[in-house]
């Protein structure tokens, strides 16, 4: 699941183009569910001007950039993205760590806007995921019926209990804050302050979520840290009290359930797609084995059998439309 692509000043939805190219067999790649632009409020976390004057962006961003104010504009933004091929809708309903113009715990949607976001997305039979760190915004989003909360750093036990009761998924994304904290002095002062607060809060939040039995899915916010390190999220989950088998389920059966595709993927069962990975070692006893994947099969086709250099694409030295040996 790719939860957003944004190139300031451009309306190109490159994630849709990439997904379509993979699905048509033009290039080799993973099965993708994409969100296109994230939807957010003027001056909020997804506002591409980032708190600067609009001349930096070239113009004032609008609903076609994902920036929408008021229920009607939000519905229009949802329709625009679905029209262009979005599989899932992503919105930012609280401030963020990297956005300079907002506080991380301040709600950015009104209750009416939140209701419009959820209603329109579900009416079009799509799932809605929301970026949310703050507790009050999280509670409003859960009550409105969002399908998942991304991050949830400051969610209190009462709000996590509400998630449990409503069946809302939490995607904790522990790795980004871990990475930011490893180089905290390189960021602007406002980012440092928010990152430190989130780093402290997320550990207690995650432990509470595990204890309460909140449903969780795997996500990393990759891009905040270099791609290719996604599997490190598993160890962070386990280190904070989640059993290894449950951590693995967040990226398999749980994820498929959240996405509404559990009838096709998520578990190895007769009648489902043959999506398989393998690694040396037992990840239930050493979760870091997930960082050493040596075999990848997609729909019964071998994509990798050996270290990364053994990938059919890497061996060929060029992009292929078919896996050798088919």
Where are these regions (language model features)?
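Glycine-enriched alpha-helix->loop->beta-strand junction motifs that scaffold or abut catalytic
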Residues: 143-148, 164-170, 187-190, 213-215, ...
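Extracellular/periplasmic ectodomains of large secreted or surface enzymes and adhesion receptors
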Residues: 301, 305-326
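Divalent metal-coordination and catalytic microenvironments
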Residues: 32, 85, 89, 121, ...
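Histidine/acidic-residue-rich catalytic or RNA/ligand-binding cores of hydrolases
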Residues: 15, 44-48, 99-101, 138-144, ...
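Divalent-metal coordination cores built from histidine and acidic residues
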Residues: 1-126, 159-161, 166-186
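His/Asp/Glu-enriched, well-ordered alpha-helical/loop segment
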Residues: 123-127, 187-190, 198-283, 302
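Short hydrophobic/aromatic-enriched beta-strand-loop microsegments
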Residues: 147-154, 170-172, 296
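Alpha-helical segments flanking ligand/cofactor-binding loops in enzyme cores
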Residues: 79, 115, 119, 139-142, ...
């Amino acid at each position: 699941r790719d939860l957003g692509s944004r190139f300031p000043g451009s309306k190109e939805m490159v994630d849709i183009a990439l997904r379509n190219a993979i699905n048509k067999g033009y290039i080799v790649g993973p099965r993708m569910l994409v969100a296109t632009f994230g939807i957010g409020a003027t001056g909020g976390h997804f506002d591409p001007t980032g708190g600067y004057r609009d001349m930096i962006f070239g113009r004032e961003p609008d609903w076609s950039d994902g920036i929408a104010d008021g229920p009607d504009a939000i519905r229009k933004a949802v329709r625009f993205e679905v029209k262009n091929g979005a599989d899932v809708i992503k919105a930012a309903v609280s401030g963020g760590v990297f956005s300079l113009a907002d506080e991380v715990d301040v709600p950015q949607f009104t209750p009416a806007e939140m209701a419009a976001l959820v209603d329109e997305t579900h009416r079009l039979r799509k799932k809605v995921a929301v970026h949310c760190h703050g507790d009050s915004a999280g509670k409003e989003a859960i009550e409105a019926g969002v399908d998942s909360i991304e991050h949830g750093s400051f969610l209190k036990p009462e709000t996590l209990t509400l998630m449990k009761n409503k069946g809302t998924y939490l995607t904790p994304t522990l790795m980004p804050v871990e990475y930011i904290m490893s180089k905290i002095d390189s960021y602007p002062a406002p980012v440092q302050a928010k990152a430190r607060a989130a780093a402290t809060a997320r550990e207690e939040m995650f432990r509470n979520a595990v204890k309460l039995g909140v449903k969780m899915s795997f996500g990393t916010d990759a891009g905040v840290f270099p791609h290719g390190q996604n599997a490190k999220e598993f160890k962070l989950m386990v280190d904070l009290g989640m059993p290894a088998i449950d951590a693995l389920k967040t990226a398999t059966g749980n994820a498929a359930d959240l996405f509404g595709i559990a009838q096709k993927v998520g578990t190895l069962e007769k009648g489902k797609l043959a999506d398989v990975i393998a690694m040396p070692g037992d990840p239930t006893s050493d979760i870091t084995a997930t960082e050493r994947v040596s075999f990848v099969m997609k729909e019964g086709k071998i994509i990798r059998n050996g270290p990364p250099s053994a990938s059919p694409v890497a061996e060929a030295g060029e992009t292929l439309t078919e896996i050798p040996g088919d």
